[in-house]
Amino acid sequence: MYKLFFIAKNNLKKHKGEVAILFALMFLAAMLLFCSITLILSGDKAVSACKDKYHAADLIVDVPQMDKEELRKIIESVDATEKCEIVPVAQIAADYYYGDMDSEDAVSFSYYVFDSSLPTYLNAFPEEFENLKDDEIVLPYYLSYTNGIGEDYHIIIGGKDYAFKVKGYAENLYFATTMNISGFYALVSHDVFEEICGKVDPVSVQLFASCKTKEGTDIDDYDVAVQRALPSDITPFTVTIDTMDVATTAITTIASSLIIVFTLLLIVMSVIIMHFSIKNFIELNIQNIGLLQATGYTAKSLRLACITEQMIIGVIATAAGILGGILCTDPLRYLSGMLSGLSGFDGISVPALVSTIVGIPLMVLVGSFIATRSYKKLTVLESLRSGITSHNFKKNHFPLETNRMPLSLALACKNNFGALKKSIFVILIIALLTMSTCIGFALFQNWALDNKTLLRLVGYEFSDIEAGTVGDEDFIEAVSKDPAVRKVNTLTTFQSVEVSYQDKTTSLGIDVYRNVNALENNYFLEGHLPEKENEIVLTNMESDILGVTLGDIVNVKSMTGTGTVPYIVSGIDQKMNNTGKKAMMSEAGIKRINSDYQYMSALIFLNDPSKAKEVKKQLEKDYPNIQFMLGEDVIGSSIETVVKAMEGICVIFVIATCFVVILTQLLLTRAQVIRERTDLGVSKALGYTSGELIRRTLMTNMPTITIGIILGILLHIAFSNQLFLTVFSFFGIKQIIFQTDLIWLVITAALILVCALVTAFLSSRGITKLEPVRILKEE
């Protein structure tokens, strides 16, 4: 065994450059794998920690203002109820600004404002946040990355500017991110809460019930039971803890999954490069291998020595990668908190540790086992003759005497076809890198620069201005006549509506629009919009849950009466909103189950969206009792975390791609210069300049890199949407089209080519130091 380690140790010393390159690749792969698995598992741990620490309710029930004790009796009458706590909440649309911003820069968003003098056991907040002062406010945890404790924070409600100091940040699983209940969770003093309630529409002040169920209770069944127990004229908004679990970890899961996919590609590339490195080592040291064989070493023992060498690199690189991941605990904690809105990141993840410790060395073992099979084919005589056989029967595709290409290009093509396997490996590496970089740019384009694709996936109809007014037809008529307005639609969302088909039942949210044909952000899959009063559109997720197809009849529970009302499934769409648990109706359709229906929000679309802020100010003057929000602000606040995550992924992909291209080119060019040292010396003796020889070396790798880039772009075009579809499938997303503009493909190609050319040029500078006479004497 010592002999194997002795050979492996000396081999490592002999080609330190290649060892360093392989180590760097494996280190990067190990660190990314450890960090991404840690991040993806941290979400569930943070959720569990939040549940235990703050006693998360199994169900929340938000109802319009009614008698508090009556609501308590109704909920407690449901057998599975173990505990119920009820507090008032003000659901408002407001403008806010902080830090260096002023009132002119205020951003619109919705708030769920709670009274800090009413602490609860379920969905609790820390004791230090009880009975706040009038100038103090507590905000959701994910805002801690944009606002510091003690900083100024202003909310404009009903024309009054409330100036606060940030007291701290609370973790509430139901408001953990904008993917949960859309709106900022806020705690204020009792007096400020009462003042706010007096300023807003009474409809906005509701009761917020937190319910704990008995052990073993099915939460969905309990949700249905609570809704059925409520009076028929009450339309509740209910959310289960299971839905919040998915929503809280959604962005973390998406971001981490994409990084894991890239990491797996990186591992595959590392194995390919290792395979080439082993082949190259055998080629360059074939005489030494022959001497060892002649002295009694078998092919098996030499093969084991090579595998041992690669395993040493792999194990040390894995350990270093894990250490690097552990040192990244603070950045990971920051990223986890920003994506999940919770602070429960606990650092080292044992599953991530085990997966990395086992995964990377195992891939190295398998890759080196396959690559070292060449040892079995070597004979002593062939090895001592430097592997040169008497004849080469391969076709000469580029005869120099008849070829019209430039000499450097012709020689480059001869080299590539002469070492076809190596060329294929390089093409595969560059293709995978190109594909992953294009994916990063596609995410950046579709989610960060232009969010139309994201908005369609979310499935929320964002307008230029959103007005929170209930059933005011005069307002709709007046605004529609405004010359600055392009169109007006209405939106009302009913949550937790019971829909059944045969023996299957589900609870979902229903979006109701006045003009369904005017929708701009709906992602329709099949069928048609619910134009008639007896039609309903279900998301792909809900249609799968119920097992329905187009034309089937589902029963929707009446909101103002008893029994159910039948609807025909006229279409299937898809959306991430409410984790895919959605349906859509027209106003005529909703009135069949809610005869008291009145719209809740007016969606105002402008001819010139750039003037939205001016139009909003004028509307606030004309209608002081109506709350207005800028659609752009709502979009920004809702998807800000997603955009930052996609920007981060793009940066990771680009940096890692440049890093791998540089390392690959270092390995290839260095090996080429060493392998062709004699040929280069002869060429110099024949009169070729160092510049010409460097140019020839550069040209050798350019054809394979160019082909790899083209192949990678084609792979991106062919398979990237399928990859995205797999990542988003847990939202019920069935169809997705991410556009990648030509400019990003050109940037990717240029990035890889520039990195490859510059690296190859710098690493081939050693040609200038070659001395023909000395080289020929050595030979």
Spans of features found by a protein language model:
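Short helix-loop junctions at transmembrane helix boundaries
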Residues: I322-S355, R695, T706-R774
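The feature marks short, hydrophobic/small-residue-biased sequence motifs that occur predominantly
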Residues: S36-I37, E85-N131, A163-N172, L187, ...
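Short cytosolic juxtamembrane segments of multi-pass membrane proteins
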Residues: Y2, L378-K394, R765-E779
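Hydrophobic secondary-structure segments that place a key small or acidic residue at a functional site
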Residues: F125-F193, H528-E587
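Juxtamembrane segments of multi-pass membrane proteins
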Residues: L59-V61, L407-E533, V537-M541, T549-D552, ...
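Hydrophobic alpha-helical transmembrane segments of multi-pass inner-membrane transport and secretion
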Residues: H15-G43, A250-G290, T308-G325, V354-L362, ...
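Peri-transmembrane interface segments
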Residues: G17, L39, G43-C50, D218-V268, ...
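Membrane-interface junction motifs in transport/secretion proteins
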Residues: M26-I74, L443-F475, M600, I604
